[in-house]
Amino acid sequence: MHLLPELASHHAVSIPELLVSRDERQARQHVWLKRHPVPLVSFTVVAPGPIKDSEVTRRIFNHGVTALRALAAKQGWQIQEQAALVSASGPEGMLSIAAPARDLKLATIELEHSHPLGRLWDIDVLTPEGEILSRRDYSLPPRRCLLCEQSAAVCARGKTHQLTDLLNRMEALLNDVDACNVN
């Protein structure tokens, strides 16, 4: 289920392409939920800027896939099906996991908080009925900015930071993880 970093497209995605890609992801999620009546983990990489598919995002994605598989194994949860693909919005993974949806969401939240790359992962858990379990459902604050600890949404809307600074921080986090062999 890993993606080859050297095959990244480096395509600068437009807003309309991004919106179509998100609609297509939602349609794929519904197909998966019909095929597997268990919770679905939908996993993407948080990538600022217009280039969503790069060597860096694919390497970050691959670490996330490894961490999600390890989480399922540790908890004794069966992965019924898994797939990876690349869309206009970057690397995407889907894993149908036989586990209680709320427990799965809590475990993925903990993974996002505990793993050094967790802030670069967007891990959604959908119930078998298609409901997305949100951070708000667990009274958690919004995602923090990579650079200043403010709300990431506020910094993104206000263009508080230079794109190069955000991308450099992403790459530094990835290089630290690779240097320490963290999965």
Swiss-Prot record:
EC number: 2.7.7.61
UniProt family annotation: Belongs to the CitX family.
Pfam families for this protein: CitX
Biological role: Transfers 2-(5''-triphosphoribosyl)-3'-dephosphocoenzyme-A on a serine residue to the apo-acyl carrier protein (gamma chain) of the citrate lyase to yield holo-acyl carrier protein.
GO biological process terms on file: prosthetic group biosynthetic process
Name recorded for this polypeptide: Apo-citrate lyase phosphoribosyl-dephospho-CoA transferase
Keywords: Nucleotidyltransferase, Transferase
Catalysed reaction, written as an equation: apo-[citrate lyase ACP] + 2'-(5''-triphospho-alpha-D-ribosyl)-3'-dephospho-CoA = holo-[citrate lyase ACP] + diphosphate
HAMAP family for this protein: CitX (MF_00398)
Domain of life: Bacteria
Molecular function GO terms recorded: holo-citrate lyase synthase activity
Conditions for induction: Repressed by H-NS. Part of the citCDEFXG operon.
UniProt organism field: Escherichia coli (strain K12)
Keyword Protein transport: no
UniProt-listed InterPro entries: CitX
